Amino acid sequence: MTGHTPAGNNTANIIKRNEMTLIKSISGIRGTIGGRVGNTLNPLDIVKFTSAYATFIRRTSKVASNKIVVGRDARISGPMVRKVVCGTLMGMGFDVVDIGLATTPTTEIAVTMEGACGGIIITASHNPRMWNALKLLNEKGEFLNKEEGNE
């Protein structure tokens, strides 16, 4: 058949197109869900970044609380990412306040209302649907600054 692309090649092209390199910035860690470790936002990367954040919060937070607030948007990957994030935080001894579906401002406010030592927002905002992100908050419900994020 003329013009036919073998399924293997087509699948490889789709995967390559959908596997975007992780983006680490002041607003968090963003990437496409799945794919190779270190290149995308897959469960192992989520555990790695969540545990690094938890270690940072434990070392730097001025709040006596052991609570971390977790909120997420309605992306299809949200429940999976939430389970990995919450499980990692609980495994590290934190009390997770899972507020479920919530906007970024709602999650930011929940951090201060709960007297939490930090928060994680699971959202990729304006990025395409195959993306997701971990947006990291301090005890004031503010995004980590560049210096904090680099730690």
Please report, for each region that a protein language model flagged, where it lies by residue.
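Generic hydrophobic-segment detector
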Residues: M1, R17-T21, S61, T123, ...
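Helix N-cap and loop-to-helix transition residues
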Residues: S25, N42, T103, L144-N145
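Ferredoxin-reductase
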Residues: K62-E142
